[in-house]
Amino acid sequence: MARNSLPTITAGEAGLNRYLDEIRKFPMLEPQEEYMLGKRYAEHGDRDAAHKLVTSHLRLVAKIAMGYRGYGLPIGEVVSEGNVGLMQAVKKFDPERGFRLATYAMWWIKASIQEYILRSWSLVKMGTTANQKRLFFNLRRLKGRIQAIDDGDLKPEHVKEIATKLQVSEEEVISMNRRLHGDASLNAPIKASEGESGQWQDWLVDDHESQEAVLIEQDELETRRRMLAKAMGVLNDRERRIFEARRLAEDPVTLEELSSEFDISRERVRQIEVRAFEKVQEAVQKEALEAARALRVVDA
């Protein structure tokens, strides 16, 4: 997309460290500068402008890519796929819409990386059932949320909690955890430039991006809400009421209360809840898959 080449990652930890050092040299853009560069590329196809937009966001790609280290794939390839998503985002970026490129690009980056993971992981590793796929993409996040130490097998109470949250069996949780175990910790030591040492999480911290990170997080939350609201359109009135009462309320309504409200058994309420969740999840996944496929569409 640009005449200027991007830094490349060579194999091994040393190669990754060199890459991180290189991309830190690219300056971050002020909002007005980003706007003008976006205009130059959108209106005139200015490749130098596009190159500056891409290089100024390579750190964002690296940050996102680090979150996918637990899938057993070469981090260099994960970063490269994220860079493909970033370049697609730059091609589609419209500065007149009023939001920053980072906010827009993060979705393209994540979609590109996730599509690469889906292509790369064998069905033997990932599994073919809906439960296995649900675990594949949610287990690591839930382990972090409940502060489960990732040093081997999960504690029984953690297995039970994850199984309940994802509506899967405890045996499936244990099996998938063993398949995915071995991801690198953000506390793992790395050797930085000029003889300095530190941890992965130290590199990820950048005070200059703190305000932008907050804005990105807010935008991500709002986007998730919009996606959920759209996905819930597939539910009928009863399914929607039960789904909201059981899954979205701060204090979930009991099966007993809902069974009285609809004059049906508690087991029937539970079945409707599970089915509604599956329908919403399927709708969200369909939208995400369509977004991922769009990444492969190259403008003529």
Curated annotation (Swiss-Prot):
Tell me the segments the record calls region Sigma-70 factor domain-4.
231-282
User: Where does the motif Interaction with polymerase core subunit RpoC lie?
Assistant: 77-80
Q: Which domain of life is it from?
A: Bacteria
Chain intervals for the UniProt region annotation (Sigma-70 factor domain-2): 53-122
> Where found, per UniProt?
Cytoplasm
Residues within the DNA-binding region(s): 255-274
Q: Which GO terms describe its biological process?
A: DNA-templated transcription initiation; response to heat
* Gene Ontology CC: cytoplasm
Family (UniProt): Belongs to the sigma-70 factor family. RpoH subfamily.
Q: What does this protein do?
A: Sigma factors are initiation factors that promote the attachment of RNA polymerase to specific initiation sites and are then released. This sigma factor is involved in regulation of expression of heat shock genes.
Q: What is this protein called?
A: RNA polymerase sigma factor RpoH
Which source organism does the UniProt entry give?
Rhizobium radiobacter (Agrobacterium tumefaciens)
Q: Which gene encodes it?
A: rpoH
